[in-house]
Amino acid sequence: MKKSIAFGVLILAILSFQINSAFADKSAVSIEGPTKVDKGTEVPLRITVTHNANSSSHYTEWLKVIANKKEIARWDYTTDKRPEAAQFTREIKIKVEEDMEVIAEASCNKHGSRGPAIHRISVK
């Protein structure tokens, strides 16, 4: 009986850890900007990162922006040089000469990324 109770407690502890890991706070990104522009137009893009923490032990470690498979912007953060807040925004300008796929992704130093955000811009 004691063995089965101990085994049950162990299983609950493992499941609890797995559930917490699955819902751990990962850095998430959103992209705001126009979706259709004239060829040659320089457009602003707002990249917003959302994270639950911004302390010396738990913060967004990096943010990168890729346009048509080429990295066009990157910010790296450290314990001593963290983002200004748990949620923050970066603005970039990009000249659109052809249809573009812009991908932004950020990563938490402990839990990783929720995955990339994708924004498509079409040339009229």
Short names for language-model regions:
Residues 44-52, 91:
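Short edge beta-strand/loop segments characteristic of extracellular beta-sandwich folds
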Residues 71-82, 120:
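Solvent-exposed serine/threonine-rich low-complexity stretches and specific carbohydrate-binding patches
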Residues 82-91:
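Aromatic sugar-binding surface patches on proteins
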Residues 61-66:
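Beta-strand signatures of extracellular beta-sandwich domains
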Residues 42, 97-101:
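Extracellular Ig-like/FN3 beta-sandwich strand-entry sites
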Residues 23-44:
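N-terminal edge beta-strand
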